[in-house]
Amino acid sequence: MSISLRCAAALLLTGILLNGCGNSEGSADIRVLNVSIDYSTVDLYLDNGTTNTPTITGTTYGTLTPYKGVSGGAYTVEFTNNGVQSSLKSLSENLAARTSKTYVSYGDIGGFGFLEILENQDPPDSGYTMVQIIDAAPDAGSVDVYLTDPAATLADSSPTFSGVAGGVVGSGFLTITDGTYRLRVTGAGNQSDIRLDSVTGTSFSNQEILSIVLGGTRGGVLVNATVIPQQGTATPITNPYARVRAVAGIPSGSNLSASLSGSTLLTSAAANTVSSYSLVQAGTAQLNLTLNNGALTPTSQTLNPGWDYTILVLNGSSVAGTTTTLLADDNRLPTSSTYAKISLVNAMSSLGDPVTLNVNYTPEANAVALGNSSATSQVTAGTADTEIDTVDATTSTTLFSNIQATLTGNGVYDLFMFGSAAAPVAALHINRQQ
């Protein structure tokens, strides 16, 4: 058996359209695939030095447009937000007549980019397929890509593409036997760090030339994929999983167990415990909790594919009974390695007041209510020289202060505040570091 993919798993990158095959006599044919979550609708302009023309407009997230034929020549290719003329990013290049290209737009706010796929490759010999990886998911960090027999285990497999970096067309084409392949993506060098699994496999046809585009997700760690045959119709592979962890905001001396759709998150965990993330099937999931050896009524949680979540369980003097809150986590990386990201989670179940987070005397999260988390803030990274303080937003009382905290570059952190005003507990938790 060999290596391939195309009709894979679930489709969340909805609306991937058909695209007529190129190309018109004397023209260059271009199209756009948009995999940017933050820039969910984009326009492509072509500037020939005389006029700046909106050429492909209104490309929504997950959509591959039909080809647009343009006169061959030198252009500035420019992307903008839909309906806005200010440039997100531009590139000067020559669009040669009788050639075809797909532009892939991607990125977060402040980190927009686009890559291009050249679609005039000669086909491989009969019985083979050519495959390349286009990594438009820089937030995922460096990844390994496996194309295997659908039944093969990762432990018995080697990466087809190793250490693929985000934001580059870096893999080059690999010629493989045609057939059905299971696509799996892991963190580089770590087979247990699953980022995508197409499970059943995708068919790679005889003499096909395929580009597999990896796209980012809302959580930042998992990825989606889109398989694009040269000058053909795209097939999306939507991640079937979410990543979920649980947090025990319970009184000292208590213990909590938590499972979600059969995945164990906590086992007799002490107060103030933060579990690791686990992969859980997206959709409706049943949450089962046991507090101090007593089972609580199960609840249903709705998980979006590709998202990261925290299930915050609270029990204490400021809470009526036991509450659970599903918090969406933003674990996308900072814009550069000189920065870190941080958010505040208010789990002070025996206080009840909102809490404010200051980093180097600057408020980064204001009056976060009990049972909630703040938006993620980007701050300057530092080693043993960052001051982090939390304050009771009602009384202005300092709850926690660390004048020698370390926030590592490219790290994503949560500061969990537990306990009461008399006995506050702070836990600075690193969610990921690239």
Regions found by a protein language model. Name each.
Residues 1-19:
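Sec-dependent bacterial lipoprotein signal peptides
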